[in-house]
Swiss-Prot record:
The keyword Protein biosynthesis does not apply. Coiled coil: none annotated. One of its GO terms (biological process) is regulation of DNA repair. InterPro entries: RecX_HTH_1st, RecX_HTH_2nd, RecX_HTH_3rd, Regulatory_RecX, WH-like_DNA-bd_sf. Modulates RecA activity. Its main location: cytoplasm. Keywords: Cytoplasm. Belongs to the RecX family. It is found in: Cytoplasm. GO terms for cellular component: cytoplasm. HAMAP family: RecX. This is Regulatory protein RecX. Gene3D superfamilies: Winged helix-like DNA-binding domain superfamily/Winged helix DNA-binding domain.
């Protein structure tokens, strides 16, 4: 039991107030509360404060502070509910207070996992090279419910996925190494899978893509063969050819082109 003996504005924040409570046989209690809490409980000098009322005041102020922290966190970008929960927990806010804050944020439309997920998909679709499966995994890490994620991915149409995957294919083609068409297509396939595109989308893109010309395949084989031949040059001719065929075939070149290269080597030699 105690009595409020002083109420003053804090120097740091004009919306927070120092409350000094005189308690019998105990040292005075000094705490700060938000102006909304001050008004809610109609706090004033001379007011009697029992332990139950004090707990209610402290709890209400904890909600107000956590709410302000959540708003500041939301000021940078939209957030999922789970992001807000994790942020407030790191700030030391207890779960009952967090739930109170979330209820208020939902009511005021500051948080909405459906709107958040839909906006997230649109943003990633328009600003990144991610496929839907990668975006889905990111939304799962952000704590968005599976049913909400499924609905949000409608924002990323199948045709848009094909266009995005084809763009990655064309970029990879421009940066193509000296490799066989088979090795190139496998490398691009793995890249598109890591980016989160489905097998169906990848199959369409690779089928539509124009692979190596025959001359490009010969040039790539020549580059790889020149690297490998030094490794086997000391072998007798039959073993040398066997080793070269095996090594170049593993790199995706056809036996016909490999044998053609070996014949040219014989002619040059």
């Amino acid at each position: 039991m105690g009595t409020i003996v002083d109420i003053t504005v804090t120097k740091e924040n004009a919306e927070r107030f120092w409350i000094v409570i005189h308690r019998d046989n105990e040292s005075a209690l000094k705490l700060t509360v938000d102006q909304d809490v001050l008004l809610k409980f109609r706090l004033k000098k001379g007011m009697i404060i029992d332990d139950a009322l004090l707990r209610d005041i402290v709890y209400a102020d904890g909600i107000k502070k956590a709410y302000q922290q959540a708003l500041y966190f939301l000021a940078h970008r939209m957030r999922s509910e789970q992001e807000i929960v994790e942020h407030l927990r790191k700030k030391g806010v207890v779960d009952p207070v967090i739930e109170e804050v979330l209820e208020k944020l939902r009511a005021e439309r500051y948080v909405d996992d459906e709107a958040f997920a839909a906006a997230y998909v649109r943003t990633q679709k328009n600003t990144s090279t991610k496929g839907p499966r990668l975006i889905q995994a990111e939304l799962e890490r952000l704590g968005v419910p599976a049913s909400v994620i499924e609905q949000s991915l409608v924002e990323y149409s199948f045709n848009e996925q094909v266009i995005a995957a084809r763009s990655l294919y064309e970029k990879a083609k421009k940066q193509r190494r000296a490799e066989s068409a088979r090795a190139f297509l496998e490398r691009v396939k793995q890249q598109l899978m890591r980016k989160g595109f489905s097998h169906e989308v990848i199959a369409i893109v690779l089928a539509d893509g124009s692979g190596h010309t025959e001359e490009e395949e010969r040039e790539a084989l020549h580059v790889q063969a020149e690297k490998i031949r030094r490794r086997y040059a000391h072998h007798p001719r039959p073993l040398y050819e066997q080793k070269m065929r095996q090594a170049l075939y593993r790199k995706g070149f056809s036996l016909a082109l490999i044998d053609e290269w070996l014949r040219r080597q014989d002619d040059d030699g």
